[in-house]
């Protein structure tokens, strides 16, 4: 038998075994993205070493507890021993999900990541357990993040979790996303000012509501806030939202209230003076709300239940207006939206039939400018 075919025959069992037991971590050919899925009952955690060259890293823990790593490494008091290794990492974006992690381990890792160039951190489907260690010195020693995203993360300290986590991050956070939170009733007296935060996204918290929004928007803790997203956040009235914003002292330029069931409001809203973009799509509105800001750059009223075109005087002065997907433009759209929404599905906005190469929005704008 020729040597080369013979060698291939000998390797076949190894190749078959390799396909049957794939590595939990995969690094792409450009050393940019690395994804680990430790879903096996006894995962090979050492496979994560493959991700050391990557810029974007995702670690999915398969629901396992990371308690064993707390016993193996003292990241809290002896973090400098890891400094050289962490400084060499290229990672800029890190996602960790589906694990149970002891609080000392999580905060210890954050402290070690202070030596890294990490800019974006996302935690998803995580249960933080145990008691946190004492806070670090006054100067924060954690990573200098620009973006922090948290989805379905449970903390052992209730409303104090944000202030506790904040102590382990360097100042300068610009974007904060919190979805499916177990509590947003923060201990505001303990929360430090987010002086650089321009974007706050509290979407996908249906139990929040206007009262919860007052507790979440700690007064005068978000002085630089420009973009506020509250999609599917249990908002009921525009007046209630406006009151919460006023109490918190925030002046967002962009406000997203889409996917909330808004009802008709008898009280007029005192809008933030800086507001120039308002998204009210998928809110079930049957008419244009009264008391909208006098002037907006962007107003999105698409995918609602408007049965007629807005009348003169109902709309503010607006540069970019979207009314696509309303019943007066798309016959049957209202019934379709109601059926899908009741089933828990948020449909894509139906396209408007208006216009020969022109979107319904642009076509309507041309007609609307006569009475705006």
UniProtKB/Swiss-Prot annotation:
Indicate how the chain sits in the lipid bilayer: Lipid-anchor; GPI-anchor
Proregion residues excised on maturation = 343-372
Q: Where are the LRR repeats?
A: 54-82, 83-118, 119-145, 146-173, 174-197, 198-225, 226-252, 253-275, 276-296, 297-318, 319-346
Job of this protein: Coreceptor for bacterial lipopolysaccharide. In concert with LBP, binds to monomeric lipopolysaccharide and delivers it to the LY96/TLR4 complex, thereby mediating the innate immune response to bacterial lipopolysaccharide (LPS). Acts via MyD88, TIRAP and TRAF6, leading to NF-kappa-B activation, cytokine secretion and the inflammatory response.
Q: Which organism is it from?
A: Oryctolagus cuniculus
| Disulphide connectivity of cysteines | 25-36, 34-51, 188-218, 242-269
Which residues, renumbered to this chain, are glycosylated? 37, 152, 279, 320
Q: GO molecular-function annotation terms? A: lipopolysaccharide binding
Q: Cite the positions of GPI-anchor amidated asparagine lipidation.
A: 342
The domain section of the record reads:
The C-terminal leucine-rich repeat (LRR) region is required for responses to smooth LPS.
Residue ranges of the region described as Required for response to bacterial lipopolysaccharide (LPS): 287-372
Name the chain's protein. Answer: Monocyte differentiation antigen CD14
Q: Where is the signal peptide?
A: 1-17
**Sorted alphabetically, which InterPro entries does this protein's record hold?**
LRR_dom_sf, Monocyte_diff_Ag_CD14
């Amino acid at each position: 038998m020729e040597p080369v075919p013979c060698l291939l025959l000998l390797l076949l069992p190894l190749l078959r075994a390799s396909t049957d037991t794939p590595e939990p971590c995969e690094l792409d050919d450009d050393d940019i993205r690395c994804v680990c899925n430790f879903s096996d009952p006894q995962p090979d955690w050492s496979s994560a070493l493959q991700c050391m060259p990557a810029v974007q890293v995702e670690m999915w823990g398969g629901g396992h507890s990371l308690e064993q790593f707390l016993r193996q490494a003292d990241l809290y008091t002896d973090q400098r021993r890891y400094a050289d290794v962490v400084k060499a990492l290229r990672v800029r974006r890190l996602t960790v999900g589906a694990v149970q992690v002891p609080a000392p381990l999580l905060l210890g890792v954050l402290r070690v990541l202070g030596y890294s160039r990490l800019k974006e951190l996302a935690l998803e489907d995580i249960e933080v357990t145990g008691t946190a260690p004492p806070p670090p010195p006054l100067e924060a020693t954690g990573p200098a993040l620009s973006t922090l995203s948290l989805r379905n993360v449970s903390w052992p300290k209730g409303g104090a979790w944000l202030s506790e986590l904040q102590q382990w991050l360097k100042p300068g956070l610009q974007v904060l996303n919190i979805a499916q939170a177990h509590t947003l009733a923060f201990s505001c007296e303990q929360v430090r000012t987010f002086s650089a935060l321009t974007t706050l996204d509290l979407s996908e918290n249906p139990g929040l509501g206007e009262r919860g929004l007052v507790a979440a928007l700690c007064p005068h803790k978000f002085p630089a806030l420009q973009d506020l997203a509250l999609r599917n956040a249990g908002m009921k009235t525009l007046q209630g939202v406006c009151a919460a914003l006023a109490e918190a002292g925030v002046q967002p330029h962009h406000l997203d209230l889409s996917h909330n069931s808004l009802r008709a409001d008898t009280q007029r809203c005192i809008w933030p003076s800086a507001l120039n973009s308002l998204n009210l799509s998928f809110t079930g509105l049957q008419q244009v709300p009264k008391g909208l800001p006098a002037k907006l750059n962007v107003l999105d009223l698409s995918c609602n239940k408007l049965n007629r075109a807005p009348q003169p005087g109902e709309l503010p002065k607006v540069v970019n207006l979207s009314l696509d997907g309303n019943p007066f433009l798309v016959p049957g759209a209202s019934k379709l939206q109601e059926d899908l929404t009741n089933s828990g599905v948020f449909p894509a906005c139906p396209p408007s039939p208006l216009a020969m190469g022109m979107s319904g929005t642009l076509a309507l704008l041309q007609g609307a400018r006569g009475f705006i």
